[in-house]
Amino acid sequence: MYGDFKQHLQHELESIKEAGLYKTERVICSPQRSAIEVAEKECLNFCANNYLGLSDNPRLIEAAKKAMDERGFGMSSVRFICGCQDIHKALEKAIADYFGTEDTILYAACFDANGGVFEPLFTEQDAIISDSLNHASIIDGVRLCKAVRYRYANANMEELEDCLKRAQAQRFRIIVTDGVFSMDGNAAPLDEICRLAKEYRALVMVDECHSAGVLGATGRGITELYNLRGEVDILTGTLGKAFGGAIGGFTTGRKEIIDMLRQRSRPYLFSNSLPPAVVGAGIEMFKMLEESNEHHDRLVENVAFFREKMIAAGFDIKPTVSAICAVMLYDAKLSQDFAAELQKKGIFVTGFYYPVVPKGQARIRVQVSAGHTREQLEKCVAAFIEVGKELGVLK
């Protein structure tokens, strides 16, 4: 039987390669940081989600070691059997305090948090209204739920209002949006979303994965940016991006919502608890962010500097308030060739093209970090200009 299936898979894989969509893994041989070793060559890393530059932070590494020494390597259990240590509860409280919410529940990843949030809370009597560019984990989570589904074009408030009007027959309604959309780097118009939610009696959920640690005066995410702390019912997020870059997801928000997720959210009920090392480092990370805004402030300065230099050089950059800078090239092959040439010059980035982004919208996604020095940013801009001229993007 496998012979026929193998042949089918080989044919599918070959089709993916012929379409130029086959993904290969580039192997890093160093810690994740602003300068990394790839294929025995040092590169400047501009494609990690390491927004606050904490992935190799010595204080977090020591906290992880300490937690492992004191609490062990792993939990060998789900939370409700025997997988809950006091440090798990302490991390949940730290997250709630950071975002100004009532309670928090931890997951193995934010993919699980988004995948496990809808089915326990909503039924066929309810409606989920989702932005068209929401993350794949939200899309999959919505598919697992029997609620009526509505979708509006990215950040289009007229379409959102139309969906809300059509959903008035449902019992409960929830608007779901990414805080920052990962491919364009644009922020959701959360002020308008919350205004419409109040008018049409809807709940609001925001995925803070690319906005937490980045947006707002102190980096507390899109709710801080719009002065809406405590106004959003559900926030999801990750420890795998700005917050140290390891692994782990969370849902934080209204107490009763979190309590129901503890009872019925399947990824929470049937997945091992986060290991003590990750939890211990997470607690220490939030202590660091409470003590100082230096990492966030440096990130803001770096993003402003990079964007200014790239726009002055003549590149087409998507407007954004986030740390994601989408350098638009439009052609899929050009984006791949551009990224390959940059790597030869010691700049580690990735070209994105269909089906990750719409056809004709290929780009290089540059992710700026607080860990980048001014010299590294200048080197990146210079390499972009050089390759841009070589490939005819710049005159």
Question: Could you say what each language-model-derived stretch is?
Answer:
Residues 3, 58, 62-66, 70, ...:
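PLP-dependent enzyme catalytic core of the Aspartate aminotransferase-like
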Residues 297-306, 311-346, 356, 360-361, ...:
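Conserved PLP-binding catalytic core of the aspartate aminotransferase-like
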Residues 78-84, 92-116:
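Short loop-beta-helix segment that forms the pyridoxal 5′-phosphate
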Residues 9-11, 15-73, 202:
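N-terminal "arm"/small-domain region of PLP-dependent enzymes with the aminotransferase-like
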Residues 150, 154-206:
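Active-site phosphate-binding strand-loop segment of PLP-dependent enzymes
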Residues 200-203, 210, 215-321, 334:
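Active-site C-terminal subdomain of aminotransferase-like
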Residues 117-136:
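Conserved PLP-anchoring active-site segment centered on the Schiff-base-forming lysine
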